Amino acid sequence: MLDAAAKLFVDPGYAATPLTAVAAEAGVAVQTVYAVFGNKRQLLSDLVDVTLVGDDEQVAMAERSFVADIRALTGLRAKLTRYARHLAETHARQVHVMLALAGAASADADAAAIWRKNLEDRRRGMAMFAADLAASGEVLVSQERAADVLWLAQDVRNYDWLVRERGWPVERFERWFVDSVAAVLGAPD
């Protein structure tokens, strides 16, 4: 059902897709969609969560293996490089859904609430990452500014613009992320 929702929420779009269409695409009764998700908003929320992490495991983001990998590394660039690889993998998986969500947020209150929650969750995650990076001793800006820079740089729309629109190889996107963030974090406020 999530695959069907992902397909239809991207095209023709969230607002244009009734749950009956999701059910038909998934080959299930609409009652099944309601039984599993309750409503369209919850279906969208679950879809965003699953595309973000790549599975439906109930594991907090801070407990995911890539976070342990980053924490085990030393040095600003090493940590950013590992995060950039995770970021590119995540964006490749979620770009279509997240762009559809961003578009739907301008016209639909439920989508707007989910988009806002996603932005806030990402900002909290980047605040935790900024604190970890500060421990390297190489960050010369405030943790608040570091979190803001990380939050902006990791936005899915950057991946869309550079990789999908401009045709950058993923490796170049990863280098751009590391170089851009390291340059700002390593320069005094």
Question: Which sequence ranges carry the predicted segments?
Answer:
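Helix-turn-helix
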Residues: 4, 8-42, 46
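Solvent-exposed, amphipathic alpha-helical segments
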Residues: 4-12, 65-69, 97, 149, ...
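Flexible coil/turn residues that form the inter-helical turn or adjacent wing/linker of helix-turn-helix
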Residues: 15-16, 155, 166
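Conserved catalytic core of Hanks-type protein kinase domains
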Residues: 36, 90, 152-153
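Hydrophobic alpha-helical connector segments
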Residues: 40-42, 46, 57-92, 147
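Amphipathic alpha-helical packing segments from all-alpha helical-bundle domains
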Residues: 85-102, 109-137, 144-148, 175, ...
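Short helix-capping/turn signature of helix-turn-helix
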Residues: 103-108, 153-156
